Amino acid sequence: MSLLTEVETYVLSIVPSGPLKAEIAQRLEDVFAGKNTDLEALMEWLKTRPILSPLTKGILGFVFTLTVPSERGLQRRRFVQNALNGNGDPNNMDRAVKLYRKLKREITFHGAKEVALSYSTGALASCMGLIYNRMGTVTTEAAFGLVCATCEQIADSQHRSHRQMVTTTNPLIRHENRMVLASTTAKAMEQMAGSSEQAAEAMEVASQARQMVQAMRTVGTHPSSSAGLKDDLLENLQAYQKRMGVQMQRFK
């Protein structure tokens, strides 16, 4: 796996799924392939994206700045600086300086990542802030190692939180989660449907599912009433895909 492929993998792991994720993936691919060289336009685009947390925007801004060649005097962006200030905690800044000194001695991506993984997310963000604000310089490989270590920590905590939700025994949370998943799957079906004859059928199924979820939320139903809702939808989706000659098992 190449260095840039690895960086793209880690960065995308912290971006929530949806159309925006696909857009960001495309932007990253273009940047890494040297196709997008207008850093200012890229940062302006990133700044106005909805849904993303300030830290995720800060990390993406840092990656874009590292990768896109720019004029020396190009101004640093406030939204990235604010996201990478470690919540203004002086302890984070102290640790960030210590980490920065270690990163100065690291020249490889994996070496830098290993060193960085032993620090807190706040310290890692502050360290990125130091480099972003040109208070210090490290090799691009070391900076990418720092980025990937930060993303790994964020993805770990997101995964723990997701696992807690999936394994919860609280019937109300499970019920709502099933309805949200059914609704998301329905939306995906509508987006994939396109404009063929069978598409009308897929759209109909998706639309009915969304109406059912809406009704269940409006009226309030028993927590077990949503059981099987997403699975039924998936069966319909897969039957539709088979007829269209498409095989996608990814929604499972």
From Swiss-Prot:
Residues 165-252 are annotated as: RNP-binding. It is found in: Virion membrane; Host nucleus. The keyword Protein biosynthesis does not apply. One of its GO terms (molecular function) is structural constituent of virion. Homodimer and homomultimer. Interacts with NEP. Binds ribonucleocapsid by both interacting with genomic RNA and NP protein. May interact with HA and NA. Cannot bind NP without genomic RNA. Most abundant protein in virion. When expressed alone can form virus-like particles in transfected cells. This is Matrix protein 1. It comes from Influenza A virus (strain A/Duck/England/1/1956 H11N6).
